[in-house]
Amino acid sequence: MRQRILQLRKRIKEEKPLIHCITNPISIHDCANVILAVGARPIMAEHPAEVADITASAGALMLNLGNITDARIKSMKRSMRTAMENKIPVLLDLVGVACSDLRLDLARELLSIGHPAVLKGNMSELLAVSGLPSHAIGIDAGAQDALTAENMETVSEVLRAFSRSNQAIVLATGKQDFVTDGERVVLVQNGSAALSGITGTGCMVGALTAAFLPGCEDTITKEMTDSIETGVWSGVEMGSNGRSGNYLAAAVLGTALMGIAGEEAEKISRGPGSFQVNLLDEIYGLSDRQLLDLLKIEMY
């Protein structure tokens, strides 16, 4: 995994893929900047009349349900259809689905159109979309839904099943981030309390992960082909061009990079204003050696 994420990071810097984001106005500026910071190119088009054209030319699509509007609902549906038709990987960020029936219904409609590469949310949001009881406080996860040592086995079973049923990587954010492809589980334990002191850091994790999705395309191996032919999904999506996307590494890299950058930025920041600036600098400037040395993950 460690070598894989370094290769992925390098590939994005070299290829500079276009990442189409339909996101909320609260974090749109920050999402665009973190995509630029890792070497990809953001485009934030959201008018319903143009989004299909934009998505068709992109390397990945990010849909963020925060601060939703009628126009963005229409645009997200159109872009989701276009992405599915063109085998473009999608990250769906389930912001607020645990506190809003409008967003929950939209999330389910988008999932009925096709399978995203990554489904991202906090534990309350993922439980809500799974049809299970959740205890969100606004867009924040409720304490009762938090991942703990005591409920790890139960939560792991729920999220792995949700991953398999949606044929998507599931990324559950929290004090430790839980990433699964339905079989493998990676716990990312990097992070800083300062990240919750500014707006948009969760959205930025989604943007970072989306930026790395185009770099996950690899030539199909025999193992991947056998997995697809036998109906066993393990984070691999077959595209019409004979390529695959193994998206687990993108989700791990997106969350780890934000967590490590947060840790490093906190050390040199006086408060939330300087932290926000330093966070972007750390995402941009973190070396591969630092990334490997500071990475805290558990795999099982």
What are these regions (language model features)?
Residues 1-44:
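Glycine-rich phosphate/adenosyl-contacting loop at the front of the ribokinase-like
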Residues 23-28, 193-206:
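Glycine/serine-rich anion-binding loops at beta->alpha junctions
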Residues 34-86:
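Active-site cofactor/substrate anionic-group-binding motifs, chiefly glycine-
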Residues 72-121:
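Glycine/small-residue-rich loop that forms an oxyanion/phosphate-binding "nest" at active or ligand-binding sites
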Residues 128, 199-242, 251-256:
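Short, small-residue alpha-helix embedded
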Residues 223-236, 259-300:
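Charged C-terminal helix
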